[in-house]
């Protein structure tokens, strides 16, 4: 920026009425007092001697190569905005409708910026320590429609190309109000962003600080609002498979957005997203934004337990007839009702449903109803099914639990091994190395070059196979077909071996049932129950481990959900135990 060349421009600033102009690298005049950029560019004295091509270039603004060492002036929230945009683009490529990015996520993000007083309000406060005078930008607290769009423009979002900026008839995005700050405040020694240092130190009560994990919370809330066919476990798995930017999301920042120092602690992620952690952040985000009641989850919606149960039954190669049993469990417990499935963050008793975990828990309960899973009955029923299948090879085969167990154990062990190898080979350091200051930059880049060189040399020595192309994302992790003899498909098998005719209805041959949790915890630890593997049968452990791996959740997390389903299904049993415990307490008192 050249201050001397801008002295000839003597008009007053429309924002602060000051006469102190500088010249941007694009050739436009900007106010050094309030940083307001005008549409006026430097005038040419004699246009007769200049060809038409140069006149067009001047009209667009004098394009000068900006020194990339300095980069753009940007705020931390703009970085998160860029990550959200990339994630929305990735979701759209996975088949999600464009309304999620252009409408739902767009409005959620605008609401966050307004609630956190970073934009879309009369007095935006960017930091708690630096005192700035913010000029009114003619914004109202409720009038969002009049504001420029944030997420529906080009991938640069708030950063438009210089060619677009010079056109007066094009409405360029301006996500943040104009700040009146001194020149020394426009650069940060300890971070690439303007407010990186202060953002990392900020601890304002009642304001939710944005983080990279919370971007996934925004994405899931948008998916839930649209009732899309992506569950939270699917979303986290797509992140793990690098179909959705997360770990190295900052790598997609424009080259001019310099990121170093304190920015590293804000945008760099060194762990995979955890289901429980992200679910808690979803509740935090929804509560902070004061979001209204979400659209109802009806029987036709993908997130309804009946549909999700069908999906997971196909996933784990269980018979199709089991869907009738899961539907009965859903109906008996009432977890398929619209009121139960509704997500209302601002309600007094807000219910938070883990739709995928709940559906899997229903299947576990159905398996216990049919096979008991006590390391005894399921094997006895398997012997009966095996004998029947040997005698009646032309008839519809009965479901053999032992054979299914052997097939699934082999399949899940292979899948786990590949998953663990992929995690072990994952490169946590991205292509763009992060550094703490400009002084460290050459050293960090040199080290990165050495690492890449060593990796190439090592790969040639061990003669490693070239990188396999990414598989297209799918909602299913297993594929079962009738033609595969090594991995037989059990979808068409019958449950006649475990059911019996009683009147006009079918009932289970097994009349017993054991509760996963006898007594629920009432302390303040927020855990309904505990899970110790040694206290449960091997069959039950295998079922929990199988579904826990599919959803990438802890086994104890699924066990807790199973216990809650059983509590709703067997209310009488739990009421009896509660009465007995209360009587024993009374006798102790007397």
Curated annotation (Swiss-Prot):
<comment type="similarity">
    <text>Belongs to the RRN7/TAF1B family.</text>
</comment>
<feature type="modified residue" description="N-acetylmethionine">
    <location>
        <position position="1"/>
    </location>
</feature>
<keyword id="KW-0862">Zinc</keyword>
<dbReference type="GO" id="GO:0008270">
    <property type="term" value="F:zinc ion binding"/>
</dbReference>
<keyword id="KW-0805">Transcription regulation</keyword>
<keyword id="KW-0238">DNA-binding</keyword>
<dbReference type="GO" id="GO:0001164">
    <property type="term" value="F:RNA polymerase I core promoter sequence-specific DNA binding"/>
</dbReference>
<dbReference type="GO" id="GO:0005668">
    <property type="term" value="C:RNA polymerase transcription factor SL1 complex"/>
</dbReference>
<feature type="region of interest" description="B-reader">
    <location>
        <begin position="40"/>
        <end position="68"/>
    </location>
</feature>
<feature type="binding site">
    <location>
        <position position="31"/>
    </location>
    <ligand>
        <name>Zn(2+)</name>
    </ligand>
</feature>
<dbReference type="GO" id="GO:0001188">
    <property type="term" value="P:RNA polymerase I preinitiation complex assembly"/>
</dbReference>
<dbReference type="InterPro" id="IPR048538">
    <property type="entry name" value="Rrn7_cyclin_C"/>
</dbReference>
<comment type="subunit">
    <text>Interacts with FLNA (via N-terminus). Component of the transcription factor SL1/TIF-IB complex, composed of TBP and at least TAF1A, TAF1B, TAF1C and TAF1D. In the complex interacts directly with TBP, TAF1A and TAF1C. Interaction of the SL1/TIF-IB subunits with TBP excludes interaction of TBP with the transcription factor IID (TFIID) subunits. Interacts with TBP and RRN3. Part of Pol I pre-initiation complex (PIC), in which Pol I core assembles with RRN3 and promoter-bound UTBF and SL1/TIF-IB complex.</text>
</comment>
<feature type="region of interest" description="C-terminal cyclin fold">
    <location>
        <begin position="263"/>
        <end position="373"/>
    </location>
</feature>
<feature type="binding site">
    <location>
        <position position="34"/>
    </location>
    <ligand>
        <name>Zn(2+)</name>
    </ligand>
</feature>
<feature type="region of interest" description="N-terminal cyclin fold">
    <location>
        <begin position="74"/>
        <end position="262"/>
    </location>
</feature>
<feature type="region of interest" description="B-linker">
    <location>
        <begin position="69"/>
        <end position="73"/>
    </location>
</feature>
<keyword id="KW-0479">Metal-binding</keyword>
<protein>
    <recommendedName>
        <fullName>TATA box-binding protein-associated factor RNA polymerase I subunit B</fullName>
    </recommendedName>
</protein>
<dbReference type="Pfam" id="PF20645">
    <property type="entry name" value="Rrn7_cyclin_C"/>
</dbReference>
<dbReference type="InterPro" id="IPR021752">
    <property type="entry name" value="TF_Rrn7_Zf"/>
</dbReference>
<dbReference type="Pfam" id="PF11781">
    <property type="entry name" value="Zn_ribbon_RRN7"/>
</dbReference>
<keyword id="KW-0804">Transcription</keyword>
<keyword id="KW-0863">Zinc-finger</keyword>
<dbReference type="GO" id="GO:0070860">
    <property type="term" value="C:RNA polymerase I core factor complex"/>
</dbReference>
<dbReference type="GO" id="GO:0042790">
    <property type="term" value="P:nucleolar large rRNA transcription by RNA polymerase I"/>
</dbReference>
<feature type="zinc finger region" description="RRN7-type">
    <location>
        <begin position="4"/>
        <end position="39"/>
    </location>
</feature>
<comment type="function">
    <text>Component of RNA polymerase I core factor complex that acts as a GTF2B/TFIIB-like factor and plays a key role in multiple steps during transcription initiation such as pre-initiation complex (PIC) assembly and postpolymerase recruitment events in polymerase I (Pol I) transcription. Binds rDNA promoters and plays a role in Pol I recruitment as a component of the SL1/TIF-IB complex and, possibly, directly through its interaction with RRN3.</text>
</comment>
<dbReference type="InterPro" id="IPR048540">
    <property type="entry name" value="Rrn7_cyclin_N"/>
</dbReference>
<keyword id="KW-0539">Nucleus</keyword>
<dbReference type="InterPro" id="IPR033599">
    <property type="entry name" value="TAF1B/Rrn7"/>
</dbReference>
<keyword id="KW-0007">Acetylation</keyword>
<dbReference type="Pfam" id="PF20644">
    <property type="entry name" value="Rrn7_cyclin_N"/>
</dbReference>
<feature type="binding site">
    <location>
        <position position="13"/>
    </location>
    <ligand>
        <name>Zn(2+)</name>
    </ligand>
</feature>
<feature type="binding site">
    <location>
        <position position="16"/>
    </location>
    <ligand>
        <name>Zn(2+)</name>
    </ligand>
</feature>
């Amino acid at each position: 920026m050249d201050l001397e060349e801008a002295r000839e421009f003597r008009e007053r600033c429309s924002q602060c009425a000051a006469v102190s102009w500088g010249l941007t690298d694009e050739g436009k005049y900007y106010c050094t007092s309030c940083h307001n950029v005008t549409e006026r560019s430097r005038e040419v004295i004699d246009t007769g001697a200049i060809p038409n091509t140069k006149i067009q270039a001047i009209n667009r603004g004098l394009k000068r190569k900006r020194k990339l060492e300095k980069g753009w002036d940007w705020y931390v929230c703009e970085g998160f905005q860029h990550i959200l945009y990339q994630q929305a683009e990735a979701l759209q490529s996975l088949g999600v409708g464009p309304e999620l990015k252009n409408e739902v996520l767009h409005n959620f993000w605008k609401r966050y910026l307004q609630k956190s007083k970073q934009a879309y309000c009369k007095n935006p406060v960017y930091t708690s320590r630096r005192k700035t005078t913010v000029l009114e930008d003619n914004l109202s607290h409720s009038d969002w429609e009049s504001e420029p769009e944030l997420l529906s423009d080009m991938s640069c979002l708030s950063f438009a190309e210089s060619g677009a900026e010079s056109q007066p008839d094009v409405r360029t995005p301006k996500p943040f109000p104009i700040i009146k700050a001194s020149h020394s405040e426009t650069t940060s020694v300890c971070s690439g962003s303007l407010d990186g240092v202060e953002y990392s130190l900020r601890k304002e009560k009642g304001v939710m600080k944005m983080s990279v994990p919370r971007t996934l919370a925004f994405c899931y809330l948008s998916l839930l609002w649209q009732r899309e066919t992506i569950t939270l476990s699917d979303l986290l798995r797509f992140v793990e498979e690098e179909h959705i930017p997360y770990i190295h999301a900052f790598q997609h920042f424009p080259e001019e957005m310099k990121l170093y120092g304190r920015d590293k602690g804000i945008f760099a992620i060194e762990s995979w997203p955890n289901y429980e952690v992200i679910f808690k952040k979803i509740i935090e985000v929804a509560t902070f934004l004061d979001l209204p009641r979400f659209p109802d989850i009806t029987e036709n919606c993908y997130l309804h337990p009946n549909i999700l149960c069908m999906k997971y039954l196909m996933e784990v190669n269980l018979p199709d007839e089991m869907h009738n049993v899961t539907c009965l469990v859903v109906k008996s417990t009432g977890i398929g009702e619209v009121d139960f499935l509704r997500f209302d963050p601002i309600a007094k008793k807000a219910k938070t449903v883990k739709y995928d975990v709940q559906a899997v828990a229903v299947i576990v309960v159905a398996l216990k109803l049919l096979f008991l899973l006590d390391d005894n009955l399921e094997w006895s029923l398997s012997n009966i099914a095996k004998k029947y299948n040997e005698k009646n090879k032309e008839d519809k085969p009965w479901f053999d639990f032992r054979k299914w167990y052997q097939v699934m154990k082999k399949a899940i062990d292979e899948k786990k091994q590949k998953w663990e190898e992929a995690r072990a080979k994952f490169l946590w350091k991205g292509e763009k190395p992060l550094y703490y200051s400009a002084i460290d930059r050459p050293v960090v880049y040199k080290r990165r070059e050495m690492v890449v060189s060593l990796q190439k040399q090592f790969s040639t020595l061990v003669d490693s196979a070239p990188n396999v192309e990414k598989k297209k994302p799918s909602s299913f992790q297993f594929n079962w077909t009738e033609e595969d003899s090594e991995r037989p498909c059990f979808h068409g098998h019958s449950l006649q071996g475990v059911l019996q005719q009683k009147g006009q209805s079918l009932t289970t041959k097994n009349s017993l049932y054991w509760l996963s949790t006898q007594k629920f915890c009432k302390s303040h630890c927020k855990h309904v129950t505990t899970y110790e593997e040694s206290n449960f049968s091997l069959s039950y452990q295998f079922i929990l481990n199988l579904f826990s791996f599919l959803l990438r959740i802890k086994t104890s997390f699924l066990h807790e959900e199973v216990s809650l389903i059983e509590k709703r299904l067997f209310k009488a049993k739990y009421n009896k135990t509660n009465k007995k415990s209360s009587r024993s307490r009374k006798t102790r008192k007397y």
